[in-house]
């Protein structure tokens, strides 16, 4: 039995889909992400307490 490229691609897609689903269940939903780009600073998933606000209030977009 020989596998074609389409069969291999389909198998890879299935493995990738299962991996993404498993990762979604294993990863905590309380991840704090701070993304600093040239245009903006984005903060998501963080708990905004007094200490956190003091640490991040001076963040600004990266300058080139």
Swiss-Prot record:
Keyword Metal-binding listed: no
Transmembrane spans: 8-28
A family per Pfam: TGBp3
Top-level taxon in the UniProt lineage: Viruses
Principal location: host cell
UniProt KW Metal-binding keyword: no
Lumenal side: 1-7
Swiss-Prot/TrEMBL keywords: Host endoplasmic reticulum, Host membrane, Membrane, Transmembrane, Transmembrane helix, Transport, Viral movement protein
Residues in the Cytoplasmic compartment per record: 29-64
A GO biological process held by the record: transport of virus in host, cell to cell
Compartment list: Host endoplasmic reticulum membrane
Coiled-coil regions, chain positions: none
GO cellular component terms, A-Z: host cell endoplasmic reticulum membrane; membrane
Biological role stated in the UniProt entry: Plays a role in viral cell-to-cell propagation, by facilitating genome transport to neighboring plant cells through plasmosdesmata. May induce the formation of granular vesicles derived from the Endoplasmic reticulum, which align on actin filaments.
Protein family membership: Belongs to the Tymovirales TGBp3 protein family.
Miscellaneous note of the record: TGBp1, TGBp2 and TGBp3 seem to act together for cell-to-cell propagation. TGBp1 is the main movement protein that physically cross the plasmodesma with the viral genome. TGBp2 and TGBp3 would facilitate TGBp1 function.
Record protein name field: Movement protein TGBp3
Organism field: Chrysanthemum virus B
Lineage of the species this protein comes from: Viruses, Riboviria, Orthornavirae, Kitrinoviricota, Alsuviricetes
């Amino acid at each position: 039995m020989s596998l074609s490229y389409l069969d291999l691609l389909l198998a890879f897609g299935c493995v990738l889909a299962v991996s993404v689903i498993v990762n979604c269940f294993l990863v905590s939903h309380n991840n704090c992400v701070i993304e600093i780009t040239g245009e903006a600073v984005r903060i998501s998933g963080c708990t905004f307490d007094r200490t956190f606000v003091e640490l991040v209030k001076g963040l600004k977009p990266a300058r080139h």
